[in-house]
C-alpha cells in the first residue's frame, strides 16, 4: 500500500464524460510528496465489480471512487481529503450522505446532508441537501457519485449488480 498516493477510480461507458472528468482531475493541486493515478474501468459488469477490479490494480492508499460524470472543480480537493483522513477512524468520506439509512434501503428517499455543485434547470449552482455542522459528520450511507476511502474493503458485487 502506497500511503502517498491517490487513485481516481471510475467505471466508464461514455468517452466524453470520461475525458472531461480526467481533464479536471489533472488540474488538481497534488500535495507535495504525493502522486496520483487514474484507473478507468470499461465494460464493467457493475459498478461494484469494476471498483473491485480497480482496487486490485492500484496500490494507492486513498481511492476516489467517482461516477464518470463527476467533475472535481475544487483545486485543493486532495489536501482536504488528507485533512479529514488524519482521523484514522474515518474509513470513507463523501459529499452527500444519509445520517440514518432509510428502512426501504434507498438513500435518496431518506434525509440527506451535504452539498454539491451541479447543473439544474436554472443553470449551475450549489445544491444543499442539509446543513453539515462540522467538516465531517457521521452518516450511515454515502451517495455513490463520489466516495473516498483510505482503507480497501471489497465492494459487494453479489448485491450491487447494476450501474
Task: Map each language-model feature to its residues.
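N-proximal low-complexity "stem/linker" segments adjacent to membrane-targeting elements
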Residues: 1-27
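Conserved donor NDP-sugar-binding/catalytic core segment of glycosyltransferases
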Residues: 44, 71, 75-114
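Glycine-rich, basic loop-to-helix element that forms the pyrophosphate-binding segment
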Residues: 44-58
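Short aromatic/hydrophobic "clamp" motif used to bind/position activated sugar donors
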Residues: 63
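Catalytic metal- and UDP-sugar-binding loop of GT-A-like glycosyltransferases, i.e.
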Residues: 66-68
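A recurrent flexible, glycine/aromatic-enriched loop bordering the glycosyltransferase active site
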Residues: 125-149
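Donor nucleotide-sugar recognition loop
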Residues: 140-141, 152-163
